[in-house]
């Protein structure tokens, strides 16, 4: 990470971002509930994760493209302030939710307000519900089955043709609000970048998961 002179620390302007770690702990609530004889320390999971995203993704994921400008500018230049974050692992997304909970509850405590329960990633079922925007049986968040509107413009940023990332006029990512939101006023529920959820996706999950607990990773299902 390279800092401008005005933000340097003791004259040092470069930092190895891999050394910035966030330490946090979570509780295995299911084990705690199932095995009541366990001690609190037995169900606490301590983890350490890198704070910053992988800033080399533009080079690694597109090895044969000229992506040096994206690599150099995407994570710090103000021109990309409204663009989605990339290069974040599932573990980092989990850690951010944990940090956000701590940060929010610190503020709540300073104002003598009630704590928030917990920030977390949505389950796959929750994400799908949000992505549908209230529509039933729709292929896309805007309904479908077409990917273009009546003016011939694509409704989301994705690769519409084989080997062609530019057909939708967006070679890379675009601003988060570049396309219309769905009926829940949520943006980018299709296209632009992939999004992490709490549980993995299984196309057969409707056949064996409980509607009360649609978590495909839960062994109780």
Residue ranges with predicted function:
Residues 14, 33-221:
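Functional-site microenvironments in short loops/helix caps that host divalent-cation chemistry
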